[in-house]
Amino acid sequence: LRDYEKAIDSYRKGNSIRNARMHYDREIETKKIDNIINIFSQEFIEKYEQNNQPSDQLIFILGAPRSGTTLIEQIISAHSDVFGAGELPYIMQLANGYSRDELSTKSYPERFANENNFLPFLKDDAKIYLDKINKLVNDDSVLRTIDKMPSNYKYIGYIFLMFPNAKVINTQRNPIDTCLSIFFQNFNSGHRYSFDLNNLVFWYQEYVRLMEYWRSVFEKRMLIVDYDSVVSDTENIAKKIIKFCDLSWEEQCLSFYESERTVATASNWQVRQPIYKTSQEKSRNYGN
């Protein structure tokens, strides 16, 4: 059909109906990002990082929704030593203390402003997370396990507090392509910002602000992967990713789309296809 003007108008109308029912508070978003940055300072990380949890099993793939997290997970999980666990809620639940009644009134990141609210439980949080992960894996031969919940970008400091040896991969994509793809996706209420383009741009700017902070703190412990680079130079970028995960190269990582594992993601049909270029600079079709 290629009637892009009509298409974007239809998306606007449909999303406006959803947006009218879901309030997105920009002030709350900004305050949350401010608090995360202020609480999880370099000094804070160095003081509380748990050196007694040496596990190198965990790989976290995170970033904005629709930025390529599923593609990267599929490449890595095609490796014989890797289990892709999908999008898991455990980090968010533990960070907010949802499993502990006494902390139910203290949410993330405010819970971490007072060490009495988190320090006694940090080691337990790490154990709980690993136990949950290992129940999913149930295979002693697996060396690495992937959690690809995109929203874990908010919890990178918490992740490194528990697991200093974790591998964190942040996916990037053309910002306009990312935002349009989010706008076109029929997300649930967990993405209230996604139904209005102005709110979406605001949210994305706050996301970038936080990620730039995390990179300044954990630069040598994170890998930034650009979606467009993966599409245009798949083999070289895939080898770089596998090396970052401390794994030996396997050619099957380039044939990830042949895997029969179940994948629950907004990109579900795409993981059954070879890498394609049609999503690159897709926003050009919609003008300004």
Spans of features found by a protein language model:
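P-loop NTPase switch/communication element
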Residues: 94-112
